[in-house]
């Protein structure tokens, strides 16, 4: 449902940045108010990311007002905060389709708009990409500006600091904006600091600063004294010493919700040479009181009525796999004081809130630091503790070298609880958990499990926790099947699957939660169905038995076919000279766009009807 733009008269005049830049500066506060209201009313009707965007309204308006986008390059880190950017760059009327199949992408996306410089979704990439653009712009020599906007969470990642370290070395013209949306505005924010920002970013201060450096360049001790004096003077009122040490000129912190002050400061900083760093303080959820009070709860929202001042309560029902994991942690930690649970900033999403409160000394949130999370577990395992790394499939990609080098080579007992494995739905290409089986299966010493339901998940988590080497349990986003969960823990025999339906001619080897789809498809085909349970080691005896008793084998998984579980089945059969036709069903060799999980399963032929159809067509060849 498209919103009535006549209710937003100033916003109606700014459908593109070109139109925005024609508006009188005095109208910008009104524009921000209308943009914030429009965003709230739009996202509440479509669902999506809300609190982050509410906090970046003034910054977005100021950036597009001051800079000549898309000629000047604007990069948003992660992209949760970029909804106002989408609204102001010609996509306002499409906002009701965001995160939906064939609709607007949930994050900035190059194919969608010339204003989206970088396709994003994972954090902490903006400064590296911005630096590359800035170096190229400097060589181009046409005065093109580059701005990277990064949040206080994303900037904690090592990649961001690596980029800043390099930027200070090569010294190109670029601006990094730190959007610091902690819960309260810093005491440094206010008239004095806004005035200081204008002074420090102004041409007079810069001329004196640079001129003094040139005059004193031949006298190193005096030059160092001047540098330290300037640093200490600024340090009295600004917390930017760290960024200055990286070679950036630091300005701030300033109020990120004062659009006119932002415009003044950005205009000054636009003319400065070398790496610049602007620190702004914002409030996540700004302008909508429930989101201000609960920015985590309103980070991503379902459809809701803003006038109710609350989100709709979930209907309960079947537990999510994340909850199954969280309950396992609590139950297991009650028995095992050496259990240590690690998450890279995914406490809520991974189902670890209860555990973090009940076992705070065994809970470690390392922030957005996947590489560190994995090697932290290494140290704990060497010390004799029992670490579990809770991580999304898509983010485990960021700790791949550590998985190999720091865990698998030493055969350490670290378990990975891999959430969001398979298709996650609305977050699109950057978040689909399509590759974990492929990139883990080739690692020696790994044990990889794929549960078919909630109880299998619980018992596999126990199995992995008790295993004496590296292991992984991968499970999907969302609710389970309603299977009864056994409270007692039972370790599964490593590398053993089970036949759950006897048929003839065709055997479906199911890996993971597609098992109900396989069973439904098997009815009309009268096919055998096996729940393989283990991707590594494979149940080779069961594969051999199924190949002996059937004409065709079909593998089924929610992972890329390339290098996945099905590929492992074929590798074993070829090694053993078991010559039988094998049909691999799974995710195709392409990045999967957004849509609901059900829509994507149907589109890719991985629902029951699609599986049955694919097998029937294969048999007919």
Swiss-Prot record:
Gene3D superfamilies in the record: 3.40.50.920, 3.40.50.970
Cofactor note: Binds 1 Mg(2+) ion per subunit.
Pathway this chain belongs to: Metabolic intermediate biosynthesis; 1-deoxy-D-xylulose 5-phosphate biosynthesis; 1-deoxy-D-xylulose 5-phosphate from D-glyceraldehyde 3-phosphate and pyruvate: step 1/1
GO cellular component: cytosol
Reactions it catalyzes: D-glyceraldehyde 3-phosphate + pyruvate + H(+) = 1-deoxy-D-xylulose 5-phosphate + CO2
Known EC number: 2.2.1.7
Enzyme class, first EC level, given as a word: transferase
Domain of life from the UniProt record: Bacteria
Gene Ontology MF terms: 1-deoxy-D-xylulose-5-phosphate synthase activity; magnesium ion binding; thiamine pyrophosphate binding
Signal peptide (UniProt feature, chain positions): none
Entry keyword annotation includes Magnesium: yes
Keyword Magnesium: yes
Record field: transmembrane: none
Co-factor(s): Mg(2+); thiamine diphosphate
Entries under InterPro entries matching the protein: Dxylulose-5-P_synthase, THDP-binding, Transketo_C/PFOR_II, Transketolase-like_Pyr-bd, Transketolase_BS, Transketolase_C, Transketolase_CS
Keywords: Isoprene biosynthesis, Magnesium, Metal-binding, Thiamine biosynthesis, Thiamine pyrophosphate, Transferase
Binding-site residues for Mg(2+), renumbered to this chain: 152, 181
Oligomer and partners: Homodimer.
Entries under PANTHER family matching the protein: 1-D-DEOXYXYLULOSE 5-PHOSPHATE SYNTHASE-RELATED, 1-DEOXY-D-XYLULOSE-5-PHOSPHATE SYNTHASE, CHLOROPLASTIC
Function: Catalyzes the acyloin condensation reaction between C atoms 2 and 3 of pyruvate and glyceraldehyde 3-phosphate to yield 1-deoxy-D-xylulose-5-phosphate (DXP).
Family: Belongs to the transketolase family. DXPS subfamily.
Protein name: 1-deoxy-D-xylulose-5-phosphate synthase
Gene name of the record: dxs
